[in-house]
Design a protein with these regions (language model features):
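Bacterial N-terminal signal peptides
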Residues: 12-20
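Structural signature of WD-repeat beta-propellers
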Residues: 78, 118, 158, 203-204, ...
Length: 410
């Protein structure tokens, strides 16, 4: 049996075990998604356009098909094989490319390339101007996260534990690194990050690795989340989200593990705190924001890890990784809601519905606009402005769809 098949079976077994635990006893309550209640908005949110990369028949799949922006264009991909370029201001589709591949990891974009990976191990490189395919290569493993693009190399993770460095000109492999994949892991991989002469990436074994961009030699590796526990479920320690780099510091978070700050040059851990996340974190000014596995949004001081605030109003709503605006943090949930929180206090500041389909990937912020794509490939763009009102006046935002039902997956 090949590595991919073994990994797929392991993931399926984990899901079956988790479902079995949830269903085996009527005495044990299943965590219910928090109900959305009316709020007093401090931001005005206006939907300005929508577009779709897939048709209405597309199945909602939790894949790593997020949005990317380069210049005045946003790029999106759908599992059925289409890739589109959209004008950010108007929502007009500028071109559509058809790969006929089961796309599963992307998009990544620069001024020179648009990259998307597939579940059958292909990586496509397109011309941003017209969507023409410049080259494609076949990797040995499924691609579940966007690639990273730099002038001299492309870095991409595959589900078999490998980090590949490819030439931007034709996709030929420059070097690769590999980490052992545990017998059981979450379905997902971390997006690599290129910082100077280092490629950084998290792995399913709870480690972050830094490799030299020139030859792939390992500069350091750090164990963020040591696997612990008796069962394989308890020992899950995946780092499935991108690390964040600020100056000489690296920030990362793992599942059933820790959020930590490391030194970029050496990998030394400066501080760490218990946390569990498979969606990830974002960094802004002097704070980082983490979407936890159980649906809390937590703000921490970047230098010390001290908690600034913790918002529990969105518990068990399957939050996406957060993004930041000037005064707000934005995340999305399993029912297609987009939530804005005040950056200073964590208070809910606004809410908008995109429909009833989950949003798995992080919102993308472009100036005062927020772009999201749901798991069926529908893209929504919102313009966000401060809400001015007389003292004592308030504007209520009421949920537009019914409260979630127990049988909905989180």
């Amino acid at each position: 049996m090949n590595t991919q098949s073994t990994h797929a079976l392991a993931v399926a077994s984990a899901l079956a075990a988790l479902l079995g635990v949830a269903a085996c006893s009527k005495d044990k309550s299943i965590d219910q998604p928090a109900k959305l209640t009316p709020l007093t908005a401090s931001l005005r949110v206006q939907r300005v356009w929508t577009a779709s990369v897939d048709d209405k028949r597309a199945v909602a799949l939790r894949l790593g098909l997020g949005l990317s922006v380069a210049g005045n264009r946003v790029y999106a991909a759908g599992h059925r094989g289409d890739i589109v370029a959209i004008d950010v201001a108007s929502g007009r589709i500028l071109w559509r490319a058809r790969t006929r591949a089961p796309l599963s990891g992307g998009t990544a974009a620069s001024a020179e390339l648009v990259l998307v990976g597939s579940s059958d191990g292909q990586l496509f490189a397109l011309n941003p101007a017209d969507g023409a395919i410049r080259w494609k290569v076949r990797l040995n493993g499924e691609v579940l996260a966007p690639a990273a693009i730099a002038e001299r190399l492309i870095a991409v993770r595959t589900v078999d534990g490998k980090l590949h460095a490819l030439s931007p000109s034709d996709g030929h492999e420059l070097w690769s690194q590999e980490q052992q994949v545990p017998r059981l892991s979450l379905r997902g991989t971390a997006r690599p990050v290129i910082a100077g002469d280092l490629v950084l990436c998290g792995f399913d074994n709870g480690k972050v690795l830094a490799a030299n961009t020139n030859d792939g030699s390992v500069q350091w590796e750090a164990t963020i989340t040591p696997p612990h526990g008796r069962t394989e479920l308890e020992r899950l320690a995946d780092i499935d989200s991108s690390v964040r780099v600020s100056g000489g510091d690296v920030f990362t978070v793992g599942f059933q593990g820790r959020v930590a700050m490391l030194a970029l040059e050496t990998g030394q851990i400066w501080w760490s705190h218990e946390a569990s996340s498979f969606r990830g974190l974002t960094l802004d000014d002097d704070a980082l924001y983490v979407a936890t596995a159980d649906g809390e949004l937590v703000a921490l001081k970047a230098r010390t890890g001290a908690e600034i605030w913790r918002q529990k109003a969105l518990l068990h709503r399957g939050l996406s990784a957060p993004a930041t605006m000037e005064t707000a943090v934005v995340t999305a949930d399993f029912q297609g809601y987009v939530h804005w929180l005040d950056k200073a206090s964590g208070a809910l500041a606004a809410r908008a519905s995109t429909g009833k389909v989950r949003i798995s990937t992080a919102p993308v912020v472009v100036g005062n606009m927020v772009l999201v794509i749901n798991d069926r490939g529908r893209i929504s763009a919102f313009r966000v402005t401060p809400l001015t009102r007389p003292a004592g006046a308030g504007r209520k935002t009421v949920p537009e769809t019914p409260a979630p039902q127990p049988e909905e997956s989180k």
